[in-house]
Amino acid sequence: MAVGKNKGLSKGGKKGVKKKIVDPFTRKDWYDVKAPSMFSKRQVGTTLVNRTQGTKIASEGLKGRVFEVSLADLQADTDAERSFRKFRLIAEDVQGRNVLCNFHGMDLTTDKLRWMVKKWQTLIEANIDVKTTDGYVLRVFCIGFTNKDSLSQRKTCYAQHTQVRAIRKKMCEIITRDVTNSELREVVNKLIPDSIAKDIEKACHGIYPLRDVCIRKVKVLKRPRFEISKLMELHGEGGGGKREAGDKSERPEGYEPPVQESV
């Protein structure tokens, strides 16, 4: 009989002994996701990340994460009918246990888009790239449908090609006017009640009556250089009450600082 080591036993240890299972959640921490101050509900939810370990910093792993939230969860209960509108928020900075997010895009749910499309009408779409006053480049998509006139006896309500081109041109003009003269905060405030789409519907009524006009999607193509002060202002935590350098503090005449009893 050959004498030697049993390689199988030396590598694996004792036969039948199971490895200790470590719960991966013990190495993770929970962080609160905060939406910008444009929305009435700031607490969006929570997210997990591995704890800081060596050169791997937890906050760096959170930056750049994108959260998709329904508008009904971001606004008051009375706005529940707007649940088909989804906002995308991107994590830009971490303050303590709070992840501060910024606007990253907007979209409609698939079921809402499918519900709007009907027979015997013309679908009109337009998209345009616009730049806000604070340096964000957005691609805005708009959609609308021709509406049957109440006095018309026809079953269909198809628009002519010239009318479609005129409506598409009007859509681009109104989107450009409303976005280029506004900051990102003001653009988001217009997207929440969809006021841009209402302006388009009124302006295009003279060309052809429209229904279900809405901003279908918004993409953020380019962002300005990141500044923590602007992000804090967006979250309503900016130093609006900060004293500018060189300002004199108001003190009564003959003011003397109090004497300290101990140092």
UniProtKB/Swiss-Prot annotation:
Keywords linked to the UniProt accession: Cytoplasm, Ribonucleoprotein, Ribosomal protein
Residues covered by region (Disordered): 235-263
PROSITE patterns, per database record: RIBOSOMAL_S3AE (PS01191)
One Gene Ontology cellular component annotation held by this UniProt entry: cytosolic small ribosomal subunit
Compartment annotation: Cytoplasm
GO terms, biological process: translation
InterPro entries associated with the record: Ribosomal_eS1, Ribosomal_eS1_CS, Ribosomal_eS1_euk
Claim: RNA-binding is one of the keywords in the record: no
Skewed-composition ranges (Basic and acidic residues): 235-254
GO MF annotations in UniProt: structural constituent of ribosome
Major localisation: cytoplasm
Superkingdom field: Eukaryota
Self-association and partners: Component of the small ribosomal subunit. Mature ribosomes consist of a small (40S) and a large (60S) subunit. The 40S subunit contains about 33 different proteins and 1 molecule of RNA (18S). The 60S subunit contains about 49 different proteins and 3 molecules of RNA (28S, 5.8S and 5S).
PANTHER family associated with the record: 40S RIBOSOMAL PROTEIN S3A
Family note: Belongs to the eukaryotic ribosomal protein eS1 family.
Protein name per the record: Small ribosomal subunit protein eS1
